[in-house]
Amino acid sequence: MSTVSDPNSSNPPESAGNIRPEPIFREINAEQTDEIVEVESACMNCFETGVTRLLPTKIPFFREVVLMSFKCDHCGHINNEMQSASEIQKSGIRIELRVQSVADLNRRVVRSDNSSISIPEIELEIPVQSQKGEVTTVEGIIERTIAGLSQDQEKRRIDHPETAASIEKYIERLHRLKEVTTPFQVLLEDISGNSFIENPLAPAADPQLKTSYFTRSQQQNEQLGLYEQNHEEQHLLKPIAEDSWPIENLHGEVLQFPTNCPSCQAPCETNMKLTNIPHFKEVVIMATVCGACGHKTNEVKSGGGVEAQGVRFRVQIASREDLTRDVLKSETCSMSIPELDLEVGPHALCGRFTTVEGLLVAMRDQLDGTLFHDSADDATKQQMQRFLDTFEDVMNLKRVITLVLEDPAGNTYVQSLSDDDSEPDDKLTVERYDRSYEDNEDLGLNDMKTEGYEEKA
């Protein structure tokens, strides 16, 4: 095994006693030296010895992956694939793409081994773990299907001519699919939650792309190697008495628990504290500082349950004072700026206690590191740069905007600049609304039985 590195690099070789200066998984950057690992491996075509090159990297706006490229100098066989190196997500992901033009075929697709793909219009279904994970495009998925069906067609025409003719007709349907004479749908479902389809309109919402999350079944968890513990087994930890830790004592207590750094995966400590937000409710504030790479995160989670109604805040931002409002954004809250056609989903930014300016800075920083900065498409890069310039004008108060925060769980709060109820805040509008069926489905409330649950359904 060998590591390909820059011979002119002045960095000393890494030893066992040295702390790694940078995380293993880094975003692709032309100015950084790629740490490519080469491994000798057997060629599956001629069974001679070839070379596999491994590159651990981080896809912006997505997760950590290992890119693998195999080449055999004996027969010329080449194979490329991608393995997910990130943790299995809490929920599975389901992505629906409506392909309406040839340009949609160029959308990037990141799919793991645990993903399945289907195109209902032609009754195509690629089951889970039938193909290796890869970074490809919508057209690449169709091309790979055509290549797979075309294998052994010559032999099949001799041995089973009827089957070969049927497959040939299906291959012709796949070729016609690439012409996009009629719209069709691509459904991508990944039980590990580690798949992704590009949104070329980002940061604006894409009307052709719909993303939803689902809770895995026990069978799907076992398929990923996740097994539930038998709660009937004897536990090593002794149970805590009901009144051992009164809630009043937790308000002045900073609790710590071990975790891993989300940037470099090094072990670190997370501090957690229960606190009260004036004029609102009880929340849990968590902060993590990594001693290895210096990465800092903070997150806020609601200390209460789901409210009876959802809440929608509209904040007009026109002065420096408007940027200083305190904001408690829960993890179920989505944000939008109608003037910029910008929408940020609830999972893009975690729950946090900050200010309006802090929210805008977090949105800008996340957009500034998106997938489009290393894109070969100059038009896409210019489009993103123009949007970032416009966003900078908003930060400098050169444009008046309205920030909309919508939380179906009702656990988000925006500070009012007026303490007198008789003089309402003209720049802040608060609206309570009844949740839709889809909102309750996302919150897991439709399957929750709160009355008569002791009775058999």
Curated annotation (Swiss-Prot):
Compositionally biased residues, Basic and acidic residues: 425-438, 448-457
BP term (GO), one: protein folding
Keyword Metal-binding belongs to the record: yes
GO molecular function: protein folding chaperone; translation initiation factor binding; zinc ion binding
Gene3D superfamilies per record: ZPR1, A/B domain (2.60.120.1040), ZPR1, zinc finger domain (2.20.25.420)
Null allele phenotype: RNAi-mediated knockdown in tracheal cells results in defective gas-filling lumen in terminal branches.
SMART domains from the UniProt entry: Zpr1
Superkingdom field: Eukaryota
Keyword field contains Ribonucleoprotein: no
Polar residues bias locations: 1-13
Zinc finger map (C4-type): 43-75, 261-293
Region (Disordered): 1-21, 414-457
Keywords: Metal-binding, Repeat, Zinc, Zinc-finger
InterPro entries given in the database record: Znf_ZPR1, ZPR1, ZPR1_A/B_dom, ZPR1_jr_dom, ZPR1_Znf1/2
One GO cellular component term: nucleus
Function: Might mediate EGFR and FGFR signal transduction cascades required for lumen formation in tracheal cells.
Record-stated family: Belongs to the ZPR1 family.
Record's protein name: Zinc finger protein ZPR1
UniProt organism field: Drosophila melanogaster (Fruit fly)
Gene from which this protein is expressed: Zpr1
